[in-house]
Every structure is written in C-alpha cells, then in structure tokens.
C-alpha cells in the first residue's frame, strides 16, 4: 500500500515550489499547491477499500506537509483555527493510502484506511450520511 505514497514522494519534490508556469504546474515534477486567500486547499477524503466518500475538509501548508511526512491525515480546523490530526483524540486515525493533487494543484483527493472506525465527528463512517435525493431505480426520459 505504501508504494503509491512513495511514488508520490519520489515523483514530486517535497519542498513546495513557487508556481511559475501552467506547464510546470500541470506537467512538472514540483509540488506547487495553490492555497486560497485564507491559505487553505480543499481536500476530499474517501475510504481506500470501498471508495466511499468520507469527508470534505481543508489543509493549510503545515497540515499538508504533516500529512505527507506522517502518512496520517492532518486537516486545518476552520472553527478552532488549528491543525487537526484526524483521530488523535477519538482513536480513528486516517492512514493515508493515496494522496493526489488535481491538474491545477488547487484541490486534493486523499484515500485513507480507517479500519473499522468513523470519519464523522458524530460517529458515522462518513460525514455524508444525510441523503437529500436518493433514486433507487434509473429513470428513463419520458417516463
């Protein structure tokens, strides 16, 4: 499982590089994340086994570096204004299996192993446990 993470480390330079060109961002071998005006980058997290969407959060530069270094998920808590090592208190640590950055380097997708744990602070596996629309059968146009 660590092969995917190690290939990420070997492919990208761990030091964040200033964004110099579109080509360098999209095709280069340097990690040049684009943080927003608040210094954050969005991260979508899914279960490495099932692919289930677990949560959406944010990382600042320090959280991203800690995640890469420890191979455990660290987020930026916007409410507490602090680094949040996911599972440090609850015991439901998210072990990083794969961490990807999109072509513009302005969004992250992280695949994690949570064992039999939860990702949601209220105890559910996924923070997306509230369904707004659920279509059980495909609908056909005109029917």
Describe the function of each predicted region.
Residues 61-76:
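A short, polar/charged loop-to-alpha-helix boundary motif
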Residues 133-143:
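Single conserved hydrophobic/aromatic residue that forms the stacking wall/gate
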Residues 48-50, 60-64, 105, 115-117:
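Short, charged/polar surface micro-motifs in flexible loops or helix N-caps
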Residues 31-60:
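Short beta-strand segments
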Residues 16-38:
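Short, basic/aromatic recognition patches
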């Amino acid at each position: 499982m660590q092969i995917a993470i190690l290939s990420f480390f070997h492919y990208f330079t761990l030091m964040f590089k200033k964004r110099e060109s579109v080509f360098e961002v999209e095709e280069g071998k340097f990690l040049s994340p684009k943080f927003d005006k608040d210094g954050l980058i969005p991260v979508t997290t899914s279960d490495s086994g099932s692919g289930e969407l677990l949560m959406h959060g944010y990382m600042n530069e320090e959280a991203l570096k800690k995640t890469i270094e420890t191979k455990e998920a660290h987020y930026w808590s916007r409410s507490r204004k602090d680094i949040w090592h996911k599972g440090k208190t609850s015991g439901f640590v998210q072990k990083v299996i794969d961490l990807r950055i999109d072509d513009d380097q302005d969004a992250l997708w992280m695949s994690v192993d949570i064992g039999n744990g939860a990702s949601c602070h209220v105890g559910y596996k996924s923070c997306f446990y509230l369904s707004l629309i659920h279509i059980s059968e495909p609908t056909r146009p005109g029917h």
